[in-house]
Swiss-Prot record:
Record's subcellular location: Cell inner membrane
Record-listed E.C. numbers: 1.6.5.2
InterPro entries hit by this protein: Flavodoxin_fold, Flavoprotein-like_sf, K_H_efflux_KefF, KefG/KefF
Membrane topology: Peripheral membrane protein
GO biological process entries: positive regulation of potassium ion transmembrane transport; potassium ion transport
UniProt protein name: Glutathione-regulated potassium-efflux system ancillary protein KefF
Enzyme class: oxidoreductase
Taxonomic classification: Bacteria, Pseudomonadati, Pseudomonadota, Gammaproteobacteria, Enterobacterales
Keyword Oxidoreductase: yes
Catalysed reactions, semicolon-separated: a quinone + NADH + H(+) = a quinol + NAD(+); a quinone + NADPH + H(+) = a quinol + NADP(+)
Keyword ATP-binding: no
Signal peptide: none
Alphabetically ordered keywords of this record: Cell inner membrane, Cell membrane, Flavoprotein, FMN, Membrane, NAD, Oxidoreductase
Function: Regulatory subunit of a potassium efflux system that confers protection against electrophiles. Required for full activity of KefC. Shows redox enzymatic activity, but this enzymatic activity is not required for activation of KefC.
Amino acid sequence: MILIIYAHPYPRHSHANKRMLDQVKVLDGVEIRSLYELYPDFNIDIAAEQEAISRADLIVWQHPMQWYSTPALLKLWIDKVFSHGWAYGHNGHALKGKSVLWAVTTGGGEAHFDIGSHPGFEVLAQPLQATALYCGLQWLPPFAMHCTFVCDDETLQAQARHYKQRLLDWQETHNG
């Protein structure tokens, strides 16, 4: 099962993320949890989230880039849900054998994320990748949709279809 942890602070105002979700919500074996709709007060039900993760083979962190990072609620979700003794540490093996995909949208172009002489997007992924690897998750190459503020609808739809295909390809590889 694919579990999409969707973290858009203003989901009704989304253009790119909405199209991405519209493409994948019709797939078999996909569950979408919209954090800002579930937890507008930031009071995360840790047990419910851990139960959802336990059913998943692939976890997708889908969100818009905000100041070169994740939205606040996704960061809090990781901090709370990936708890010691469950996700890492002594007896913390709940995530081992699962995969994670970072699916992010940006308003700027890919070159906008170059930081000095460093390839910015790879640098920006490092905290999430380090968290994933520390918890025993397999880190998959990220999916990024850039320039979403200036893309026309046709381009956004094409990118959303590409996202859907990434998930279909993963399902085909892992479900035989």
